[in-house]
Amino acid sequence: EYTKEAAKVEGIAAVYFSTRPDSINESYISELKNTLLEVSSEIELAFEFGLQTVNYKTLAEVNRQHGLAEFIDAVLTAKKFNVEVGAHMILNLPGDSREDVIEGARILSALEVNHVKLHALYIRKNSVFAKKYKEGEIEICSLEEYIERVILFLENLSPDIAVQRLIGRAPDDGTVFINWDTPWWEIHDLIIKEMNDRNTYQGRSFNYLKGKALTKF
């Protein structure tokens, strides 16, 4: 019913489902497409999957209850239906390194997702992470490090993938950490400025697919 109601909104072009990668299968996607067809054949179906990180240990630490395999399966399953697929990534999860960030960009590029949204971790009050944060069990990287990670991610990301977000937002109320107490738009502008100052761009290091090691063929 929700899908039908969303599809009936005047001027709507697509209905996006943002969900976990272990929460879809072919039968579910087929049912969603048929539901949209009951309203209009011109409304597209699209998915966004929350991967967050490619580091399995980090995924377990933040209790995601899924690994990289489930994300890959979700993307490949959705692509069978010729629908747009996006991914959400958090670039400053405790335990993740710059190498994890780069590998995340490479995997999304290899899977040819259509778009990606980047986030910085925010911590809600009364959560497990809030307790660990207050007790010093986890550390959040600096804003400067986050900016560095975003740039590394973008440099390694296929230029064909749309980047729809460089930093996320969350309500100040009820959080113990969010965006280094800096407005999201200011962080966004700092990222763009730093990239311009370095004369760098998305896809600068995108040179690792399609048999890079081959020299003859």
Residue ranges and their predicted role:
Residues 109, 115, 123-217:
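Auxiliary Fe-S-binding modules of radical SAM enzymes
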Residues 1, 7-25, 43-70, 117:
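Core AdoMet radical
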Residues 2-10, 30-44, 76-80:
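Acidic (Asp/Glu)-rich catalytic clusters
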Residues 26-29, 147:
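Structural motif corresponding to alpha-helix initiation and N-cap regions
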Residues 27-28, 60, 98, 128-130, ...:
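Short, well-ordered secondary-structure micro-motifs
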Residues 28-32, 94-110, 173:
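Catalytic cores of alpha/beta
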Residues 4-12, 69-87, 111, 140-160:
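Alpha-helix-loop-beta-strand connector modules within alpha/beta enzyme cores
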Residues 22, 50, 55-56, 78-100, ...:
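Conserved strand-turn element in the central/C-terminal portion of the radical SAM core barrel
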